[in-house]
């Protein structure tokens, strides 16, 4: 049963990485993609001169 429990813990680690659950130290407990920590999230860039707000 010990091996089975270990497998479950490993699986939970993969599903919920600490970086995502803690948002890299900001607002712990909230879910956010890890790319926000390194500023690598792909943002939709609005074309300059146009206002689509």
From Swiss-Prot:
List of residues that carry Pyrrolidone carboxylic acid: 12
Residue span(s) of the pro-peptide: 1-11, 49-53
Modification after translation, per record: Contains 3 disulfide bonds.
Record-level Gene Ontology MF annotations: acetylcholine receptor inhibitor activity; ion channel regulator activity; toxin activity
Regions crossing the membrane: none
Modified residues (4-hydroxyproline): 28, 33, 48
Modified positions (Proline amide) in chain numbering: 48
Short name of one Pfam family: Toxin_8
Protein name: Conotoxin Ac4.3b
Natural source organism: Conus achatinus
Origin organism lineage: Eukaryota, Metazoa, Spiralia, Lophotrochozoa, Mollusca
């Amino acid at each position: 049963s010990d091996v089975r429990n270990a497998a479950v813990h490993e699986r939970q680690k993969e599903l919920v990485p600490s970086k995502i659950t803690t948002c890299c130290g900001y607002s712990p407990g909230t879910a956010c993609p890890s790319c926000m920590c390194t500023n690598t999230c792909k943002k939709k860039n609005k074309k300059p001169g146009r206002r689509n707000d």
